[in-house]
Amino acid sequence: FWDIGFCTGSVSVEAKLQFPHLRITAFEKRPEGVGILSDNCRKFGTPGITAVTGDFMEVELHEYPTPDAVFIGGHGGRLVDILRKIDACLPPGCPIVFNSVSAASREMFKEGIRTIGRNVKETVCMTVDAHSPIEIIKAE
């Protein structure tokens, strides 16, 4: 499992809680994210998450286990480039999941998915209040 743009590591930690056997590689541009992830791993008892810091576009992905699924939480405005990069090393049918908080990022993801020849399979909208809808989009 790859968590791209992990921020606080909440998705990685939850994935590890749900599936303790899962090999998780979490990528984050900001160095301070590693400390936050480490604290959250200790707090929730989820050791074994590999944190990788730096610009994702410069990471040598072949150095990490091929994922069964990918979650993109942060993209720094380079979502389509990230999709192209991961598509080159993902197995066929590997799910790519993205959380979108804006119409612009939702459309950017959908366009990127089309660009790499994959299809959106499912969209779930979560709304806490009228001002904070989040769409979770799954593509394969």
Language model segments and positions:
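A short glycine-rich, Lys/Arg-flanked "PGG" loop and its adjoining helix->strand segment in the class I
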Residues: D81-P95
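S-adenosyl-L-methionine
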Residues: F27-P67
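Conserved beta-strand signature within the Rossmann-like core of class I S-adenosyl-L-methionine
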Residues: G93-V101, S105
